């Protein structure tokens, strides 16, 4: 089974199975309750305080979108303060009247210091509304000087109002300074915290900005879209910034054998992944069961193929390099195989020149060139270059129209681009060429299901569910079919049956760690059984200690439990296993969100609800 992270099947078009991380090709499975195939994955990062979307981890954005759905177009009644821009200062423009208060127009001796401070503030508010910000600043400064030092709340308001005026003049340093004064006086002052967050953004103080906006999100109960959007923005920037530096110096890491086998299982028309032919092996050791056969020719490529059959993957790149350096008989095959393993270890920059060369070799087998185009196209999609990706897939279809892999992988690309009808047409083309290719049939059914589910079309949903039943009956050895069916069953709240489907996956592929993660998440959503869920995710790590999905999921759950230190440790482990800069940026955003929550808890004692 080409099991992947809990993302929609579409996401697999841009990732190797089980990773979501920049390996070309791949036929990944969606996990339970995902919804992330249509959502940017870094939205998972701000998991602070929002409800846990069990089975997906995308707590933050789910919380936001759920409120949108509940609003049902009710406008301001939605509960999301979309237009709450916090531009105006606080307090009324005219002074409040009451016992012992005059109209605030003069310096009456009968007025207390606080009264005079309020009068100065109100005068400043009038100037502010008139766009006379320098005069407003003078009035707010007067209010600050007049206000008794023990009047913390009033004094904090004056500082915040002056910060608002400085903001209009784009004096960001002064904005941050005044907001800091306001927060020191009133630590849970949302308006001052948010204004300081915006100032930090302008000053390029991303870490400080994130801490402030995190506090705001918690204090507002995730009800203000403006603050959530700022948090999302800064998390993306921080993630990309951190990943860019880290990725340069990362150590390439070969994934697990199960991961590699799952990856190659998504190709059926691929020369380099086919078993060695009789003529490529000698007969010397054919009677020795369990021992590798000697390669007949002195060929680096054929030795690499032998190592593939032995699952001795670490030696493949070096053997391919020998074939290429010698310009041997299998140079084109060696270039493609080396590029594929560069992709698998997360070295896309090293893979691209090899893929380019294979594509340009007009004399090379068309199957090799088409396969190289598929992998380069998928790599482009992972690098957020959909136009280049589409061009490569279309070229592959043009030069090798009978290649089922082209349509299978292009179908996944189309799903990622939200072109479901075109995706289904591609899956149909693949199935016509390879009627027994279960993976394509399962993914077509899942595409139809997601389309019906999103459109809330119950009759089509039921038709898709029936289609899954037919697929697992027709292809009982296809773990992918069970996994995708489990996703659909989870959506339909049929948890018991979904659990049975994951058990089928485990029976078929006991070494596939991602299935244990999916099953663990299901226990949380179904039975709220945290211990069982964590036990299964821990089992996944035991089976495959290179399963970054397991570490990421464990970290996300620990965030919800309030165990920030452990969560950060899990995210860091996942970061070290990431195979693309984009995947690494996403994981850094998770880690940064956890760090920010830790700091907010220390500074302000703010802790969102935990599991």
UniProtKB/Swiss-Prot annotation:
Residues found modified as Omega-N-methylarginine: 74
**Entry GO CC:** mitochondrial outer membrane; mitochondrion
Database matches in InterPro entries: TPR-like_helical_dom_sf, TPR_rpt
Q: What subcellular locations does the record give?
A: Mitochondrion outer membrane
**Where on the chain is N-acetylalanine found, per UniProt?**
2
Residue numbers of N6-acetyllysine PTMs: 188
Tissue expression, per UniProt?
Expressed in the base region of the oxyntic and pyloric mucosae.
Q: Glycyl lysine isopeptide (Lys-Gly) (interchain with G-Cter in SUMO2) cross-link position in this chain?
A: 278
TM segment ranges: 42-62
Residue stretches of each TPR repeat:
117-150, 156-189, 297-330, 332-365, 370-403, 404-437, 445-478, 479-512, 514-547, 548-581
Disordered as annotated region, ranges: 69-110
One GO biological process term: positive regulation of defense response to virus by host
Function as written in the Swiss-Prot or TrEMBL entry: Acts as a receptor of the preprotein translocase complex of the outer mitochondrial membrane (TOM complex). Recognizes and mediates the translocation of mitochondrial preproteins from the cytosol into the mitochondria in a chaperone dependent manner. Mediates TBK1 and IRF3 activation induced by MAVS in response to virus infection and promotes host antiviral responses during virus infection.
The entry describes its oligomerization and partners as: Forms part of the preprotein translocase complex of the outer mitochondrial membrane (TOM complex) which consists of at least 7 different proteins (TOMM5, TOMM6, TOMM7, TOMM20, TOMM22, TOMM40 and TOMM70). Interacts with CAPN8. Interacts with TRADD, TRAF6 and STING. Interacts with MAVS. Interacts with HSPA8 and HSP90AA1; both interactions are required for preprotein mitochondrial import. The interaction with HSP90AA1 is direct and mediates the association of TOMM70 with IRF3 and TBK1.
The entry sums up its family as follows: Belongs to the Tom70 family.
> What name appears for this protein in its UniProt entry?
Mitochondrial import receptor subunit TOM70
Task: Specify the species.
Answer: Mus musculus
């Amino acid at each position: 089974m080409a099991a992947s992270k809990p993302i929609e099947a579409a996401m697999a078009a841009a990732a190797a199975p089980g990773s979501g991380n920049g390996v070309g090709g791949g036929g990944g499975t969606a996990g339970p309750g995902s919804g992330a195939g249509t959502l940017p994955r870094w939205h998972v990062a701000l998991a602070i305080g929002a409800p846990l979307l069990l089975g997906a981890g995308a707590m933050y954005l789910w919380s936001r979108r759920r409120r949108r759905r509940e609003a049902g177009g009710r406008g301001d009644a939605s509960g999301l303060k979309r237009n709450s821009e916090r531009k105006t200062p606080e307090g009324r423009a005219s002074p409040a009247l009451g016992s012992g208060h005059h109209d605030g127009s003069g310096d009456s001796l009968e007025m207390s210091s606080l009264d005079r401070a309020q009068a100065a503030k109100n005068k400043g508010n009038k100037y502010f509304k008139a766009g006379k910000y320098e005069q407003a600043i003078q009035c707010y400064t007067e209010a600050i000087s007049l206000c008794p030092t023990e009047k913390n709340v009033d004094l904090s308001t004056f500082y915040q109002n002056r910060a608002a005026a400085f903001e209009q003049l784009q004096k960001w340093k002064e904005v941050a300074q005044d907001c800091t004064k306001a927060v020191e006086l009133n630590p849970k002052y949302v308006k001052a915290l948010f204004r300081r967050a915006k100032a930090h953004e302008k000053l390029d103080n991303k870490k400080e900005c994130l801490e402030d906006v995190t506090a705001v999100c918690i204090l507002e109960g995730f009800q203000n879209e403006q603050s959530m959007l700022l948090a999302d923005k800064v998390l993306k920037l921080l993630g990309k910034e951190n990943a860019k530096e880290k990725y340069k110096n990362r150590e390439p890491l070969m994934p697990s054998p199960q991961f590699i086998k799952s990856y190659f299982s998504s190709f059926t028309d691929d020369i380099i992944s086919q078993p060695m032919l009789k003529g490529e092996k000698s007969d010397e050791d054919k009677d020795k069961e369990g021992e590798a056969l000697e390669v007949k020719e002195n060929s680096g490529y054929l030795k690499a193929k032998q190592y593939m059959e032995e699952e001795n993957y670490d030696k493949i790149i070096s053997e391919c390099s020998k074939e290429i350096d010698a310009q041997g008989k299998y140079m084109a095959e060696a270039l493609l195989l080396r590029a594929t393993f560069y992709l698998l270890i997360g070295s896309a920059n090293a893979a691209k020149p090899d893929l380019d060369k294979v594509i340009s070799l007009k004399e090379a087998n068309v199957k090799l060139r088409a396969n190289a185009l598929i992998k380069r196209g998928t790599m482009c999609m992972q690098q957020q270059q959909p136009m280049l990706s589409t061009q490569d897939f279309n070229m592959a279809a043009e030069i090798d129209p009978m290649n089922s892999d082209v349509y299978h992988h292009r179908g996944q690309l189309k799903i990622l681009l939200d072109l479901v009808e075109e995706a289904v047409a591609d899956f149909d083309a693949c199935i016509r060429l390879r009627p027994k290719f279960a993976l394509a049939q399962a993914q077509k059914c899942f595409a139809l299901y997601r389309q019906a589910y999103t459109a809330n079309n119950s009759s089509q949903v039921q038709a898709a569910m029936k289609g899954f039943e037919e697929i697992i009956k027709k292809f009982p050895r296809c773990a992918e079919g069970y996994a995708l069916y489990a996703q659909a069953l989870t959506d339909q709240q049929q948890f018991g049956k979904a659990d049975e489907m994951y058990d089928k996956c485990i029976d078929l592929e006991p070494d596939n760690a991602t299935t244990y993660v999916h099953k663990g998440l299901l226990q949380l959503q179904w039975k709220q059984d945290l211990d069982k869920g964590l036990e299964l995710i821990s089992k996944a790590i035991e089976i495959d200690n290179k399963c970054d999905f397991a570490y990421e999921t464990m970290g996300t759950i620990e965030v919800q439990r309030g165990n920030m230190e452990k969560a950060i440790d899990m995210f860091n482990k996942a970061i070290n296993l990431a195979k693309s800069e984009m995947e690494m940026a996403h994981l850094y955003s998770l880690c940064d969100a956890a760090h920010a929550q830790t700091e907010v808890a220390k500074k302000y004692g703010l802790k969102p609800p935990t599991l």
